[in-house]
Amino acid sequence: MDNSEVIIRFKGLSFTYHDNQSHRPVLDDLNLQISRGERVGLIGDNGSGKTTLFHLLMGLLRPTAGAIEVFGEERQKEKDFREVREKIGLLFQDSDDQLFCPTVAEDVAFGPLNLGKSQDEALAITREVLERLGLEGFEDRLTYKLSGGEKRLISLATVLAMKPEVLILDEPSTGLDEDTVERLTEILRSSDLTYLIASHNSDFLSKTTDIVYRLGRGKLTRLVS
């Protein structure tokens, strides 16, 4: 693994919402680079721009200024972000934004099927991912009947089933009990994936990441561990 390979780079990134009456940018000339194998944490208050940054990375929003480079290429147009979405898995902050099929198996298998896997291959991936997350036997459970914590883990399963190169996790420990947070921590630490986690939980970030930045007033500040 070549840890010197920069796979995500934000250069002078700025973003302001059109309905922001204060006209203060949510992100202001922000610079960050993440190399392959790095585990990066992002902490900040509500409204500080963590989710906005993730949505910019995935092409769900467009920056007011600056550049986004992913896998060595600048990404500007919708077609530029198609490869990004295939190789980077985003866990949304709200699980209901991620889960839309009647059953757990259908939700988890949706991504692999969309990538061209057969029904049998998608089902095998679904079972493997659910087992890894300690969710054996959840295949036929109705998604809308799951608890908040269970929905969170199923959302993560849908991301992992896509076999991404990079994980972008927006508040992954929210709604999870202590035992489940511990299991999630073990899963992340044992993974060889590059990932970026936004969380209010500084203890969780200290256990799952190697570098932590604070986002505030549109700027990033690296925290000393």
Language-model features, listed with the residues they occupy:
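The feature captures the beta-strand-to-loop junction immediately N-terminal to the Walker
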Residues: 43-45
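Helix-to-loop junction immediately C-terminal to a conserved catalytic motif
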Residues: 58
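Conserved ABC transporter NBD signature motif
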Residues: 66-76, 84
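Conserved ABC ATPase "signature" region
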Residues: 120-138
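Conserved ABC ATPase signature
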Residues: 142-146, 150
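Catalytic Walker B motif of ABC-type/P-loop ATPase nucleotide-binding domains
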Residues: 167-170
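H-loop/switch region of ABC-family ATPase nucleotide-binding domains
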Residues: 199-200
